[in-house]
Amino acid sequence: MGFLNLISLVGIFGLCAIAWLFSENRDPKYFPWRIVLVGLAVQFGVGALVFLVPLAWGILQSLSGLLGIVFEAADAGARFIFGRLFVPFSGQDSFFLVPLVPGAESCATDSIGQVVPGFCGIRVGYIFAFRALPAVVFLSGLIALFYRIGLFQLITNLVTRVSYPLIRLSGAEILGGAANILVGIESAIVVRPYLRKMTRSELCAILACCFGTASSAALASYVSILRPIFPNVLPHLVAATMMGVPACFLLSKILIPETETPFTAWPVSPDRAIKSGISERAFTDERELEIAPERLSPTEAAISGAVEGVKIAISIVGALILILGIVYLLYGFLNWLTTLPAPLGNWFRVISLPNLLGILSLPFTVMTGISLNWSELWQSSVLIGRRLLETAILPYQSIVSGVSGVGDRWVGDRALLILTYTLSGFAHFAYWGIVVGAAIALVPSRRHEVIGLCWKAFLAGILATYMVGCIAGFYEGIFGADTIAVLGKS
């Protein structure tokens, strides 16, 4: 074990200590020892599989495509509404034609070339409103149907029999966390009937998993960016998401220890579930729930769930527009400060927003054991800090430039590996807006509490992404793990 591997190992416990410093209740009797020990064991187990057992790579790749058919089904409905231009078939690019600039012999570099003589093809790309939001509507209706037939109630009860006695996690928490391995905020829809009765600790854990992991759709976009420099990236991104769930659980439980008894601490009988609203009725408007307590037919349940999914999508859009608008204003204000006369303008050119974010994330980046080289360490810290405002896409693109030699080549193999893991989660302000918007729509009766908990969950999600990076840093190069082979480089 090298010195950097040791730093990564110590960093895991350092992150737990930071979470404890911000805990709502630092009484030792409420410290979640079982969850911490089991959560770390699961992370180290997944890390050992992906770094030391190449056979596991194919299994993880298969897992990442498990929900492909579900998302294709959602796309089929969206394609009928919005058309093939905005919702193309799987594996196809959609584009529109623009005339070639007069006098130019070729198309711009960001186009796909001359599709027909004299016309350039411009990719439409992934449009959030036409691709992500229809998935929310479809899954909301589908999950409501599953609750109507009793599938998720059965799964929750089965999980509860093992999870709560063993590790003090409720069945609803486990169900929501497991869903995060495959989807994003849609995982909260999976446990929607339980949200109103969840304890603060449970709700924080569910929200934290949304921030500390990434959906299958996001992983696909990350793979398309990183594969040229990291050919074997897909199983590692899937592993990062799988490790992110236990990391979020243990960190959120340290931040907000469980001091109450969860509703799903024990199996819930069908009669008690119906009386408590744990059914497809949870996917209808709360006023209708009081007026019409009778059970819905399967068709009614699915349609009501889809209608509620539309409300969730609208709430997500509103929150996202607000948050990204505020971020834009912040960037604009700081850029204006750089135009002030010297020496103030010069000072703000140095104390820029990326540098401030880099300073903020530097201690956590050090904990991952990413490098002993100051330049590599600092630039890695800036990239991770930028994720807070820019999402992971632009930092990943910067990594590609840093590895391929476009500009200054500064990313080594170890830094590439750890950055890939650390940046993979949804721990950024854009997704904070998505989670807040969805959570308020899912459980409007706890609106004030949800907004407060989202900040705690956001912190847990951020720390979880660093913890996943620490796990990757610990396994890099030890026990015979060949970093070149792990990356898939020839």
Residue spans for each PLM region:
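Transmembrane helical segments that form the transport core of multi-pass membrane transport proteins
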Residues: 307-407
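Juxtamembrane and boundary regions of transmembrane helices in multi-pass small-molecule transporters
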Residues: 27, 196, 221-288, 436-443, ...
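Alpha-helical membrane segments and immediately flanking helix-loop junctions
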Residues: 164-227, 380-471
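Interfacial/capping segments of alpha-helical transmembrane domains
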Residues: 49-93, 154, 330-363, 376-383, ...
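Hydrophobic core segments of alpha-helical transmembrane domains in multi-pass membrane transport
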Residues: 11-22, 39-51, 136-144, 216, ...
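Hydrophobic alpha-helical hairpins/lids featuring a short glycine-rich hinge
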Residues: 72-161
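Intrinsically disordered, low-complexity non-transmembrane regions of multi-pass membrane transporters
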Residues: 1, 66, 77-113, 258-309, ...
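Hydrophobic transmembrane alpha-helices of multi-pass small-molecule transporters
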Residues: 1-66, 72, 280-282, 288-321, ...
